């Protein structure tokens, strides 16, 4: 099984790291081992302590003194051996603890550098290679090298097509049978694929028709969107069916209210009654005397002479002429007064109605008389 360069570098780095971690532990564990304590001088060290204990009475010394000597000798030997071993182990441990981290960090940096160089070389090699255009990835940009390769293939296919045409020639009916239709189809398919890829490579950076249509300014002869996008509504029916506006009665500030009109009418009637009262008085002294007599005497006595005088046709004619002369003057004065009052007060009553009203009111006293 052949390993690639990346796999080899990774394997070597793993081995180095494993060794850098395991070797210091081995060295440190070996330094911790202590050497056996040295035996005391004489033959006492060859025998076990029980033998010393049994042989003690043979000498001329007491057993307590011998036990103390042997104990001191062993303690001295242990202290001496442990002191020397500890000093050597401590110095070795400190040196390895300083070297190993630096060594491991340097190895790690070296591995990273190798991986970086390999990745960079791989990318440059991939740029130099020629890849065929995949049918699914149509929007991929084509490099200049790929474009040159496609142009060469296009030239080769054109040369092959020219050779086929030359073979056919004028007597091509017999030679055309030698060339199969499959080869022609294959060549045509290759030619179409190459031309398609070249067009995609040339026009890939251009805008799409949709973007060009969006960014293009509106021309003067642009007629707008078709009718399907925005329907045209006929508003004639709505205008015909629209109901007429209803005006709400709002009082005109210039017009008088009903109460004010009633008050003015009452005042006008009072003034008219006053005028009629003054005008109804007769100017003839006879009439004044008659009125005074009638006013003084509620029940006057009727005599035959007065009755005959009233029924006299001459008297009646004089009275009729006097009344006819006085009526035009009264009518003119009342007409002017009525027209002036109604103009000032804004009433819509015509002067003819006022004239007829005055005539009726003026003739009533005459009828009563």
Swiss-Prot record:
Biological-process GO terms, alphabetical? positive regulation of cytosolic calcium ion concentration; positive regulation of protein localization to cell surface; protein localization to cell surface; protein-containing complex assembly; synaptic transmission, cholinergic
For whether the record's keyword set contains Heme, the answer is no
Q: Mark the transmembrane ranges.
A: 96-116
Question: PTM N6-acetyllysine: at which residues?
Answer: 202
Q: Where is this region: Disordered?
A: 30-67, 272-295, 316-369
Q: Which GO terms describe its molecular function?
A: acetylcholine receptor binding; protein folding chaperone
Keyword terms of this UniProt record: Acetylation, Chaperone, Coiled coil, Endoplasmic reticulum, Golgi apparatus, Isopeptide bond, Membrane, Signal, Transmembrane, Transmembrane helix, Ubl conjugation
Description of how the protein assembles with itself and partners: Monomer and homodimer. Interacts with CHRNA7, CHRNA3, CHRNA4, CHRNB2, CHRNB4 and HTR3A.
Give the UniProt family note.
Belongs to the ric-3 family.
Q: Can you name this protein?
A: Protein RIC-3
What's the gene? RIC3
